[in-house]
Swiss-Prot record:
GO terms for molecular function: alkyl hydroperoxide reductase activity; hydroperoxide reductase activity; peroxiredoxin activity. One of its GO terms (biological process) is response to oxidative stress. This is Alkyl hydroperoxide reductase AhpD. Keywords: Antioxidant, Disulfide bond, Oxidoreductase, Peroxidase, Redox-active center. It comes from Caulobacter vibrioides (strain NA1000 / CB15N) (Caulobacter crescentus).
Length: 183
């Protein structure tokens, strides 16, 4: 399924989501690898099958390498774990928990398979979807320290927001109208 086919599956009330999706596919704020990495990572984070398949196919068609695609999926997988942990530690506000080492294996963060900026932008996108302020702050500071502009980080956030909204809308429509599901 293409991005256009994905847009066509959106109900009329979600027209703005489809428009935003189309605009973000060509957004020049990010280079193609970073842009499509954010799309793939966001789709993996949300996990809605139609959205994930369409975005994965579109990313491949747009030239995202298999290695960069795996890196985006790694970002989604690692953030699924770290976002829960660090968000909980942050929300508990207990100094004792913040002082403890997390003791979670994080080797894949260092061996991502994509340029570091691309990987961290994907982590920002997934952390936004998962609502982890601590991870957002950490990755944003790292990106800014490497010269990434706020507009580039904002583009990752916008991709996350739109992919999440598209996926959740399609999931809601599938629950309400299962007879319309694509086989």
């Amino acid at each position: 399924m293409s991005i256009e086919a994905l847009r066509a599956r959106l109900p009329d009330y979600a027209h703005d989501l489809g428009t935003n999706l189309a605009l973000l596919v060509d957004d020049p704020a990010l280079d193609p690898e970073a842009r499509w990495g954010c799309f793939v990572a966001s789709a993996c984070a949300v996990g809605e099958p139609q959205t994930l398949r369409a975005i994965d196919a579109a990313a491949t068609a747009a030239g995202l390498t298999a290695e960069a695609n795996r890196a985006a999926r790694k970002a989604a997988a690692m953030m699924a774990m770290t976002n829960v942990y660090f968000r909980a530690v942050h929300l508990m506000e207990g100094a004792a928990y913040q002082a403890l080492p997390c003791r979670l294996r994080l080797n894949r963060l260092a061996h991502a398979g994509a340029r570091g900026v691309t990987y961290d932008l994907s982590c920002v996108a997934v952390s936004a979807i998962n609502g982890c302020g601590a991870c957002l702050d950490s990755h944003e500071a790292d990106l800014r320290g490497r010269g990434v502009e706020p507009t580039q980080i904002q583009a990752a956030l916008r991709i996350a927001a739109v992919v999440s909204a598209v996926a959740r809308t399609l999931a809601a429509e599938a629950a309400l109208h299962p007879q319309n599901l694509e086989i």
